[in-house]
Every structure is written in structure tokens, then in C-alpha cells.
């Protein structure tokens, strides 16, 4: 923010020249777009342009959990009894999950939060990133409890070409936006002499395009790329093997559904005109969006082939997983206004038994035995009426 000296006093200018950690200018955030509006000042959560982001923040906080709440004593002995092909499936998926959440443990805060111009969305993203860190800690907790030497997992992630190939496709859009945004920050484009110029307007438009691609890629990451590994974790749980790990992954899946909704809300608000530039960009980028969905689906299919190269599991095989990925992809495309492209009925979930692991509410467990994952911390019911408890007597 810019300052000028008047006598012995320092006065704050009535405009903001660049990014600042605390904007002292009056900003009417309910009239700003989600990104690239004026920098934020007071963190206030009482007046929202989009209340849905505040609800998502509250829900994420209500779902707070720690991996240490789930016992993995049985998992360690279970792992020793797994056949070699089962160990391959379990360990390979664990490595991939570590990579994905290493990206998401940094991405939203590095890429999106600095350019966010709504307090409710900024707060939502901060909690999102924090929960992704919980996920990364959870994978470490699993690895330390299941393997005698955690290094045999961690130290081989970056030497696995299949994981590196997928990492590149996941991180490219993030990196493109972050690097371009930093160049924009360090340029003169935001200064008065350049604002509104052809060069400045063209630069910001292309920067917004990169932001769109980054958010769209994260939408696909949260909505598709986790689900092959999730399904495998749940399959072990269905077989009463590695149940603690399956329960932790179920908690992670519940969180990832919240993060998926965040990206869907952002994309749909762009599509519906939150920012006129982003509405136009969404339309221009539809062919790219379809192609990116297709690439992700194909990569997940190849991953399923790799997982089951030495044999399948009871209740799960390569063909079922590939059908499941197509079914999930259709749902994700429809949710952001795209037409489903895969020939599979929406009601025909190829792996219906995964649903109760993902939704949490379908799981009935004794509290003393395991983490009750349908429990919400700090939940408040606000639609209670005078006669709500009229039928109760003490």
C-alpha cells in the first residue's frame, strides 16, 4: 500500500497501488469478483456475497479430526499377511496419495488465496489448505505404523516414473498460474499509467485464463484423481483388512468431497457471471476442459492397469475400476455445466459398496472401537421452533 508524509504525520492514500496484507481502503466486498478485486482489509464474517463459502468453512471445521484417533495396531499385522500383489496395490496407492496431498497441502494457499477478494472465500481456502495438511500427516501416520522402515515408501516416491508423470499433469497448471501471477505482481501493469491499457488488459485476461485452468485442474484432481486409490483402500476395508487405514482414507474422502464442492462453486459462479472475463474464458476453455477430463480419466485407467498387473482383489478388478472412473467423470462434468461424455448410466455405480465409505453416514461403528466419522464438532441447529419439543416430557 502507498503512503505519503504530511508534516510529521503519515497518511494512508485513498487508493491501493498494489497487493497488501491489510487494505485500509473501504472495500465493498459484496460487489467484488471472487478473484483480482481490491485487496482485503478487515477479516469479517458477517456479510457475504456468497454465503455458500461460509457454510463450507463451517462444515470443514465441524469435521475436524486427527489421524491418531484411529488405531492402526491391527493394520501392521494385517499388512504382513497380504499377498505380494495386495502389498503392491496398497503401497502404490499410498505413494500416489502422498504426492497428491503434498500438492494440495500447498497449492490453494500459494496460488489462489493471495488473489482472493472475498473474505468468506479466503477463509474457506485457509481451512481447505489446513485440512490437506491433516491428510498428509495421516499418510505419514499410516506409513510409520504399517512399515518397519518408512523410508521404503517415502524415498521411492520421486523415483517412481508413473507417479512423476501424473505429478507433472497435476502441477503444471498450478505452476503456470503461480509464475505468471508473480510476474504480474512485479510488473508495472497494476499502476495507474498502465491500468486500462491494451497491454495491461490483455495481460490480466490471460492471467485469468491461467487461473481458470488451475482451478479446473484442481477440480479434476479432487473429483477424479483420488478415487481409484480411495476405492482400493475401501476394498481392503470391505475384506476386513487394513481397516484402520481404510477408516482414515474414508475421513480424507469426506474432506475431499468438501474441497471438490469449493472448486465446483467457484467454476459455476464464473460460468454464471461472477466476473465477465471469467464467464467468457469459461466458454473459450470448454474444449480444453473436456480434454483435461479425458486425460485424467485415461491416466487413472492406466494406473488401474498398473495396480492390478499382478492380480486382482475380491470385489475389485481393473475393469470395474475403469468403469468407476468413467462414472465418476460423468458426475463431475455435469456438476460444472459440461455434458457427460462416457457411455455409462448415472444410476449404475459400478462400485456401489464404496458409497457408504465416502458418505460416512452409512457406517455404523461402536465409538469405543473406532473414530465416529459422521460426528460434527460444533454443529448447531438453527431452525428450532417453539413447538419442536412439545411432544417430549421429563
Regions found by a protein language model. Give the residues of each.
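Single conserved hydrophobic/aromatic residue that forms the stacking wall/gate
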Residues: 1-14
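Non-heme di-metal
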Residues: 16-394
Amino acid at each position: 500500500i502507498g503512503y505519503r508524509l504530511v508534516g510529521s504525520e503519515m497518511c494512508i492514500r485513498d487508493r491501493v497501488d498494489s497487493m497488501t496484507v491489510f487494505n485500509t481502503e473501504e472495500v465493498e466486498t459484496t460487489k467484488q469478483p471472487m478473484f483480482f478485486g481490491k485487496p482485503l482489509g478487515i477479516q469479517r464474517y458477517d456479510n457475504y456475497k456468497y454465503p455458500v463459502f461460509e457454510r463450507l468453512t463451517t462444515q470443514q471445521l465441524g469435521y475436524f479430526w486427527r489421524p491418531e484417533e484411529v488405531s492402526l495396531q491391527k493394520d501392521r499385522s494385517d499388512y504382513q499377511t497380504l499377498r505380494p500383489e495386495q502389498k503392491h496395490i496398497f503401497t502404490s496407492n499410498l505413494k500416489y496419495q502422498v504426492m497428491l496431498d503434498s500438492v494440495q497441502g500447498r497449492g490453494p494457499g500459494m496460488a489462489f488465496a493471495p488473489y482472493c477478494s472475498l473474505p468468506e472465500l479466503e477463509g474457506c481456502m485457509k481451512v481447505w489448505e489446513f485440512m490437506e495438511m491433516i491428510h498428509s500427516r495421516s499418510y505419514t501416520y499410516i506409513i510409520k505404523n504399517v512399515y518397519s522402515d518408512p523410508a521404503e515408501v517415502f524415498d521411492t516416491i520421486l523415483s517412481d516414473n508413473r507417479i512423476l508423470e501424473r505429478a507433472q499433469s497435476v502441477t503444471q497448471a498450478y505452476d503456470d498460474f503461480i509464475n505468471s501471477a508473480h510476474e504480474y505482481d512485479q510488473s508495472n501493469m497494476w499502476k495507474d499509467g498502465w491500468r486500462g491499457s491494451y497491454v495491461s488488459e490483455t495481460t490480466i485476461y490471460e492471467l485469468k485464463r491461467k487461473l481458470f485452468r488451475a482451478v479446473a485442474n484442481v477440480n479434476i484432481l479432487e473429483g477424479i484423481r483420488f478415487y481409484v486409490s480411495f476405492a482400493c483402500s475401501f476394498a481392503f476395508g470391505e475384506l476386513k483388512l487394513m481397516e484402520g487405514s481404510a477408516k482414515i482414507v474414508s475421513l480424507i474422502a469426506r474432506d475431499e468431497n468438501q474441497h471438490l464442492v469449493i472448486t465446483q462453486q467457484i467454476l459455476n459462479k464464473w460460468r454464471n457471471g461472477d466476473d465477465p472475463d471469467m464467464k467468457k474464458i469459461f466458454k473459450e476453455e470448454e474444449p480444453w476442459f473436456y480434454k483435461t477430463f479425458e486425460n485424467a480419466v485415461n491416466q487413472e485407467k492406466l494406473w488401474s492397469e498398473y495396480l492390478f498387473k499382478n492380480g486382482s482383489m475380491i470385489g475389485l478388478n481393473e475393469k470395474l475400476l475403469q468403469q468407476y472412473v468413467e462414472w465418476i467423470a460423468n458426475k463431475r462434468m455435469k456438476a460444472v455445466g459440461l455434458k457427460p461424455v462416457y457411455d455409462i448410466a448415472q444410476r449404475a455405480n459400478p462400485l456401489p459398496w464404496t458409497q457408504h465409505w465416502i458418505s460416512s453416514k452409512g457406517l455404523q461403528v461402536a465409538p469405543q472401537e473406532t473414530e465416529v466419522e459422521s460426528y460434527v464438532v460444533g454443529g448447531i441447529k438453527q431452525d428450532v421452533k417453539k413447538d419442536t419439543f412439545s411432544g417430549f416430557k421429563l
